[in-house]
A protein has these predicted regions:
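Alpha-helix boundary/capping motif
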Residues: 6-8, 21
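N-terminal accessory targeting/assembly segments
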Residues: 47, 53-86
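Primarily NTPase-proximal linker/entry elements flanking Walker-type ATP/GTP-binding cores
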Residues: 74, 78-209, 216-236, 244-252, ...
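Conserved catalytic-core segment of NTP-binding enzymes
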Residues: 219, 236-254, 268-377
Length: 377
């Protein structure tokens, strides 16, 4: 039996001793807590309680976030909107109806807006069917038709108008494993989620399971101290699965609502990644049999087509159930939200629209499309 010392986010107050029992996982005895800016596999656990009354049946997972962020959404998508509709307006000059030339131009615009080839062809095919059915579609109506088809694609991928990702009763803690490569903003995403969860009255734990990089652990600890939540860590080189085990054990022992575990996001090779994620899942299940309840993939929206390749590699390595797409405010590549969600049939859960704590928003398909097409339809 190995004993793990667990400390608060200041790495001072000892909270408990957690016995580890199960398959052999080498790790150090002393494990203070720290944080990281390049999170890779995060694990959250969540149950909503207010005044000691569970409200999970009346309140979705994403409902705890403020919905008064329309202005932030509009500003964050401004570059994408200007680029896309600027190209579209130029392509429609002198045209009164949608014909083959208009559709060819639209196809090129969608591809260059990082919607992706497969998704673009699907959109064009649907518009062609609409034109054939209605016999005549004006260029003015094209924006409305295009908007409807994008909403339809996001709907088919599981995106919601109201984020109704309800937490089942008895799932405390609710466990989410978040995966992604280095540098996509995973640690920032973890920190902002921790902040918003805590602000909503939830008890949050972080686990620094990226044991391959000292900077990762330190950066996660910065977020833990900034937000005021405990962070569980081990020494460099320890097994990430053992950090996940310790974090869930501490979360259970201390009645936590949310646990975010940050682990390495190295795309070394498909088999290595798959083995690592599988082991983390297997070890977590020694604490919580049905963990993880969600696997969240974090992608950098500003990388455009690279986001598709990252999604391809992670979906091949593990089951991904949701995505967070960050850094949408810094580029005109917002089309990646539509394309990657449609191509991999995975709903977008969050979008990052700035550096502020409140700028990580739960994704709402209707608000997203309304903002993208605002002042255009």
């Amino acid at each position: 039996m190995v004993l793990a010392n667990v400390y608060d986010s200041q790495c001072q107050e000892r909270l408990e001793i957690v016995p580890y029992q199960g398959e052999e996982i080498p790790f150090a005895v002393q494990r203070p807590i720290w944080p990281d800016f390049y999170p890779f596999i995060i694990i959250f656990s969540l149950t909503l309680h207010f005044n000691n009354v569970s409200i999970i049946n009346n309140m979705g997972f994403f409902s705890i976030f403020s919905r008064e962020k329309k202005e932030t959404l509009n500003q964050g998508l401004e570059k994408t909107k200007q680029s896309f509709f600027g190209k579209l307006s130029r392509a429609l000059v002198g045209k009164s109806s949608v014909d083959d030339e208009v559709l060819d131009n639209l196809e090129e615009i969608l591809v260059t807006s990082d919607v992706g080839v497969d998704t673009t062809l699907e959109i064009i095919q649907r518009i062609e069917q609409r034109v054939a059915r209605d016999k005549y579609v004006t260029t003015t109506e094209l924006n409305h038709v295009l908007r409807d088809e994008i909403v339809g694609l996001l709907t088919e991928s599981g995106a919601q108008d109201e984020q109704e990702f309800a937490i089942p009763s008895g799932k405390k803690p609710y466990v989410v494993m978040v995966v992604g490569v280095n540098g996509v903003g995973k640690t920032t995403t973890i920190g902002k989620l921790a902040y918003q969860f805590k602000k909503a009255g939830l008890k949050v734990y972080l686990g620094a399971a990226d044991t391959f990089r000292a900077a990762a652990v330190e950066q996660l600890c910065i977020w833990g101290e900034r937000v005021g939540v405990p962070v569980i860590k081990q020494n460099m080189g320890s097994d990430p699965a053992s950090v996940a085990f310790d974090t869930l054990a501490s979360a259970l022992a201390n009645d936590a609502d949310v646990v975010l575990i940050d682990t390495a996001g190295r795309l070394h090779n498909k088999k290595g990644l798959m083995d690592e994620l599988s082991k983390i899942k297997r070890v977590m299940q020694k604490q919580i049999p049905d963990a993880p309840h969600e696997v969240l993939l974090v992608l950098d929206g500003s990388t455009g087509q690279n986001a598709f390749e990252q999604a391809r590699q992670f979906t091949a390595a593990t089951e991904v159930t949701g995505m967070a797409i960050t850094k949408l405010d810094g580029s005109a590549k917002g089309g990646v939200v539509i394309g990657v969600s449609h191509q991999f049939k995975i709903p977008v859960r969050y979008i990052g629209l700035g550096e502020g704590m409140e700028d990580l928003q739960p994704f709402d398909r209707k608000e997203f499309v309304d903002s993208l097409f605002s002042e255009q339809v």
